[in-house]
Amino acid sequence: MVHSEAKMTRPDSASASKQQLLNGNADIQETNQKRSIEKNLCSQYEEKVRPCIDLIDSLRALGVEQDLALPAIAVIGDQSSGKSSVLEALSGVALPRGSGIVTRCPLVLKLKRLVKEDEWKGKVSYRDIEVEISNALDVEEQVRKAQNVLAGEGVGISQELVTLEVSSPHVPDLTLIDLPGITRVAVGNQPADIGRQIKTLIRKYIQRQETINLVVVPSNVDIATTEALSMAQEVDPEGDRTIGILTKPDLVDKGTEEQVVDVVRNLICHLKKGYMIVKCRGQQDIQDRLSLAEALQREKAFFEENPYFRGLLEEGRASVPCLAERLTTELITHISKSLPLLENQIKESYQNLSDELQKYGTDIPEDETEKTFFLIVKITTFNQNITSFVQGEELVGPNDTRLFNKIRQEFQKWSGVIENNFRKGGEAIRRQIWTFENQYRGRELPGFVNYRTFETIIKQQIQLLEEPAIDMLHRISDLVRDTFTKVSEKNFSEFFNLHRTTKSKLEDIKLEQENEAEKSIRLHFQMEKIVYCQDHVYRGTLQKVRENEMEEEKKKKTINVWGQNTSTESSMAEILEHLNAYQHEAGNRLSTHIPLIIQFFVLQTFGQQLQKSMLQLLQDRDTYDWLLKERNDTCDKRKFLKERLARLAQARRRLAKFPG
């Protein structure tokens, strides 16, 4: 029977074993499937989240934030608001604590989540110093040391950054900037204006549109009166980029819990991004050596057991883990939105800096041969620029006018001056003719024109144009001098001795050519006192004048304005015809020849003499060092611009490689 029972039970045993095997395989399969899903989610997370944060962190490490604002989360709060406790809970490391100002420099807290197998590691960086940390317990000491180096061994603050990197399986992927706590009154050895200094530093960060402001406020105070939230509202009135964090919910007075819940649910002081609430380690917990991991467990239990706050936990508005997840999501979304604008800003800044660097030229060579070649290139480029201005071929911007066009406008005004002078003199001429006919005509018969009257009137009219011509010369000479000076400034601004020498030569040549031009102009007016014109030219012009007069007479009835006899009228009409004919020819000569004189002396010859004078500088090698001596700040400025360009160039390359 025993044997038989044994035989009878074998199939059941085998069936059970088979079922256990199937169940075991199913469990393994389910576990593997969960691991696969988890691995896939982790992979997606690594592909999307980490690269975004790493990109901005790398740009910040390059120093791009010196040139442009980067997406960031800035943490602000009044002193004793629980700000340090929140950061400790997020990072898993102890940060400097104590009374008074604890955060004395902006602290960039970079948190990077590792896979479970990797070990914790940290690093503190400031200026050119990097300190690797292998034990989380050493973080507080290293941060204090960094702050003492930057802000001094006292209670002052510094705007220089301290960067703390924490890599651990137990931290979120997140980067925060911790700012000094707001204080109102200086105590002890603190500077009298410490409150103003801190607010200025905080405002520098939170006013940037690229910054999300994380405002830490204790739950047991009136949120409307907190300085931190007030500062955030000043720079972000709509609350578009402000998140409120309530701390110390365990210290809330009984009966006020519902009011705290209303604040978290955004019913009291509205912020578009809303509020979160957390419970971190207190001073007693630290003295009792409560670990951060245990503190998280106690926090969870506190919210689960509290009838008022339990709902907030279920809604994802309470606890440090919920806060970490929320901040990571906010930062990633913020970065993604900011990248296109950031890319455009970097491109624009790079172009502006490149243009500015061109003004400072290249570094001066140390080798004497190369230095000679450098100066030759500088002077040759200057001379080529001068040639382009003289020939009217210089490059100008959309709102600028070429030098020759400005000079042409002066010449056009000159033609108008001549025309107006002759036209305004018409009535005076009529009176002079009348005076001569009635007072000075001798034994001449009526109707005979006195040639001396004609000459006298012509000379007087032309003489009135001499000083306006000289004035035009001076205006154009100053215009050319100023233009050439700008060319010198563009080419030699960083070499003050070379620029000063060029300006001196410019002034000397300008005066010399101006004097020569003035002599020629005055000589021309002296020659114009000789009333002369080629016979055939004068006859042709006179004929045209008479034809025009006849046409005018046909169009209107002749009116005897002067009321004199026909002989006088005939005499006056004839002399006016001769005057008009001669004025036409003399006016043509003046409107053409005076501009030619000015062009020749104060533009072409001025430019040629300046170019020759500049080339003569190359003959004295002993002056090269003196001529190429830079302004005190030029070399530093050039180096500064090159460093900024290098940063932006690297930033552009990293943005170009970014998969997003």
Curated annotation (Swiss-Prot):
Q: For the region Critical for lipid-binding, give the residue spans.
A: 554-557
GO MF, one term, reads: GTPase activity
User: Looking at the record, which segments are called G1 motif?
Assistant: 77-84
The record's induction entry says: By type I and type III interferons.
What is the name attached to this protein's record?
Interferon-induced GTP-binding protein Mx1
Residues recorded with modification N-acetylmethionine = 1
Looking at the record, the residues that make up the GED domain are 572-660
Region G2 motif: what ranges? 102-104
Give the record's membrane topology.
Peripheral membrane protein
Supply the domain comment: The C-terminal GTPase effector domain (GED) is involved in oligomerization and viral target recognition. The middle domain mediates self-assembly and oligomerization.
Q: What is the lineage of its organism?
A: Eukaryota, Metazoa, Chordata, Craniata, Vertebrata
- Residue ranges annotated for the Dynamin-type G domain, each copy included: 67-340
Biological source species: Equus caballus
Q: What is its main location?
A: cytoplasm
